[in-house]
Amino acid sequence: MSRIAIFFPGIGYTMDRPLLHFSRRLAAEMDYEIKPITYGGFPQQVRGDRGKMEECFRLALRQSVEFLRDVDLTAYDDILFIGKSVGTIVAACLASQSAARERIRLVLYTPLEDTFTFRLSEAIAFTGGNDLWVGGKESRIAALCAARNIPCTVIPDANHSLETNDVQKDIETLREVMERTRQFIVRRIDKAIE
């Protein structure tokens, strides 16, 4: 069974940050070919500025399309798109347009509302209960997930990095998020073995 995991980072949340670093390690342990995308050229002070956010999406989308130009997704049996923040929008957009869309599963770390403007087939989401990028305590992410039957874990008091001011709590949160991510990934592998 051929497997690939493509990573779509956030604006400032790169592959060396905990959520993406450990999810990459999980996927590698399960024999996924790893393809991390890197972006560049984003504007500064994006949060709260719709125009700058759209510019970030366009830049990330263009760079992702270029990065994936020579990757034939239809050659893979199992495809993971793992995104963080703006990367979740790019991942959802590309998944919805892909000829292999029925084989693409998405892991959405702190998705933004625009992520849900695209058709998502199989996904899991994680959001912070105090994520100011999506309205903090007024966030609609959990409701958007529920409307699409996407399991969503809300981490109380966590910010856009799924962190709080309590280091021990953050370590436990990371452990919980990685375990749920692992279970999501393993489900497809287990089905293929049956």
Predicted regions: what they are:
Residues 2-76:
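Serine-hydrolase catalytic machinery in alpha/beta-hydrolase-like enzymes
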Residues 158-173:
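Catalytic histidine-centered segment of alpha/beta-hydrolase-like enzymes
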Residues 125-131:
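Short beta-strand/loop motif that positions the catalytic acidic residue
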Residues 64-121:
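Primarily recognizes the serine-hydrolase "nucleophile elbow" in alpha/beta-hydrolase
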Residues 176, 180-192:
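C-terminal alpha-helix
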